[in-house]
Amino acid sequence: MKHKIFSHTSLLIILSVVLTFLAAGTVMYNRYDIYMKQGVRDEAAYIKTGLEEDGRDFLTDKIGDATSSRITLLGKDGDVLFDSIENPSEMENHSDRPEFIEAEKKGFGEMVRYSDTLSKQTFYYAIKLKDDQVLRVARTTDSLLMTMLSSFLLLGGLVCVIFVIEFFLVQNQ
């Protein structure tokens, strides 16, 4: 009888912990995603204002140290004029990038896709400037997902502790 109680209780505990973890993780990821994207949009608006008021002098090599985002300035034709991570002269034309095309048409564009340069899933936000250049701000999006995956070790430890407590409670009945 104790074995049956232990088995059923164990199954319920595992299901409860895993489902709670997945639900909380999903809610956290969605909120993080919303805040991260809005943060990138706000950052792009700030940099756009700086570029339109001060010109290209606003962008320096030190801007990469001031933000976790990648900043890229693209010419009308998609040529890279500035990049906070890579040497622009070694970069290919970006005129075929979805966020660039959308920014050219609508004034802004955004896309989540894999970055070959960063080797990570990245959120890109592009905004057209008054001089028809395009400012693109990008931030990797996998940080919370990686945190959740690394949390599975903690989850496993938590389940083990619960099993030990449950085992002693069932044995003492």
Model-derived segments and spans:
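Juxtamembrane segments flanking the first transmembrane helix
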Residues: 1-80, 85-90, 146
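Alpha-helical transmembrane segments of integral membrane proteins
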Residues: 4-8, 12, 150-158, 162
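Cytosolic-side ends of inner-membrane transmembrane helices, especially those
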Residues: 21-29, 158-173
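Pocket-edge positions in alpha/beta enzyme catalytic cores
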Residues: 32, 92-95, 136, 173
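Juxtamembrane alpha-helical signal-transduction segment immediately C-terminal to a transmembrane helix
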Residues: 36, 43, 144-151, 169-173
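Helix-start (N-cap) segments at beta->loop->alpha junctions
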Residues: 49-52, 130-155
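Membrane-proximal, non-catalytic sensory/regulatory domains of signal-transducing membrane proteins
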Residues: 53, 90-131
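Structured catalytic cores of enzymes that bind and process phosphorylated ligands/cofactors
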Residues: 69-81, 110, 122-141
